[in-house]
């Protein structure tokens, strides 16, 4: 995609932040406007995360204008809002490739640019990393500054508050910027507040405060009186002094779209000692009315026409697994009032919006708090309810100890509906769901099911929901295959797979040809079936990763020369490893090939592209099997 840079006379001159810093401050508003226009033009033609970046235009310009990046460390939490940062740091002309195979990474990524201090993707990591960098900078003694930008959503995670608590305790020089685009914790935004922020962060006030502390430090009553006077002044127009109690110097809230006020305030705060906290209020989707009105809808967008008021509708397709899960929740809740559904801030992505509206008393969004969500569900189960935790595969990693300690050890009936299992696609390494089978399979008391289509998915949801212990149903991102769904009371037998294809015996076949049985786990069945037909192989849908269908495995091993396991999880510790362990424990001779994700992190690209690259499509499966048996 070729962009006419003549439409952006100032932005076209900015190839690195140093170019920005060489421009007069009075031009920053024009630069911000051009940057917002460029972002809109680029993402609308290529797709990508959208509304968050529109909301951080002025903040991004101000930070790169004030700080000497990349020498100074700038960290973006999660990274959805970092598109403007990428544009200003040498990646403007590649932005149209973002989230595409071989293109720019969807989030800040250390391998991509020296300006990306921390690789991110999951929320709430920025403050911890920034604190570590601040400690290292102090030891380095080169006056290197550290800044972390975190959103109000990410601030709900326990990890963020753990880091704030530590930072306030050890009091290293650092700046935390809260990008509050929800307006939920700050209403006092305007000229008076911006003026107060400049005043409280300015050298006269801070100098007076520090001098007073030194002068009056040995007179506790007077020191306390001075502190109370300062807090009274702040308290007239700012929110709670919670962050001050943690040990931070709190400034704000201020208008995050007034770039000159941002520059003035950040300049004032740059050289302050100790932990600083700046509260900035922004509008998600700023500058594009449709995104401002519906920031969730415009959080990530397909290609669209900015002149039109609606995003293009995708062509009618089969329901997604998320939709199938959401419908199952509603159907089950209609007949069982004990069902309760828990999600850590993923209602839209997990297909739970309708359920939340129809059954608000049975729905709990606990915010970005994966650890809490799991133990909260344990409490619900102990209390006699029937909890279902809807969570992405990559996010369940954060609740691992709670899964073991609070659910599995106590053998509680909590069902986990694990969405985005397997190869997710464009969000890259941080979001690929390729580890859940490996870290869950070793946990006692746990039943793990992997559906091959939407009918199997609902059967497994029905089955897991009725179990009196922990269960997991893991399903992929994407659409079903058009199967007819069962009723909500239909279940399947635990630990039993099904045979899909039986190899044809050819009398004239040479003895050198090996008979093959493919054991498919989960959504790989479609590609495995194509491979089995080409190879004249037996194919089974294993259904269960735990407990395995040991009888079926024994039968297949006895009747075939070679077994092949196929899964969209890491080979190490995955479903295939479970088959290996069982057969080796029997002491039986076996020739077995495990096909799955090898020992590396999967990059970004479409699901189809990554399956092909990993040789997890039908063509790749055939190649791997032929290579192995020959």
Curated annotation (Swiss-Prot):
Its EC number is 2.2.1.7. It comes from the Bacteria. GO terms for molecular function: 1-deoxy-D-xylulose-5-phosphate synthase activity; magnesium ion binding; thiamine pyrophosphate binding. SUPFAM superfamilies: Thiamin diphosphate-binding fold (THDP-binding) (SSF52518), TK C-terminal domain-like (SSF52922). Thiamine diphosphate binds at residues 80, 121-123, 153-154, 181, 288, 370. GO terms for cellular component: cytosol. It is an enzyme of class 2 (transferase). One of its GO terms (biological process) is terpenoid biosynthetic process. Mg(2+) binds at residues 152, 181. It catalyses: D-glyceraldehyde 3-phosphate + pyruvate + H(+) = 1-deoxy-D-xylulose 5-phosphate + CO2. NCBIfam families: dxs, PRK05444.2-2. Catalyzes the acyloin condensation reaction between C atoms 2 and 3 of pyruvate and glyceraldehyde 3-phosphate to yield 1-deoxy-D-xylulose-5-phosphate (DXP). Homodimer. This is 1-deoxy-D-xylulose-5-phosphate synthase. It comes from Colwellia psychrerythraea (strain 34H / ATCC BAA-681). The gene is dxs.
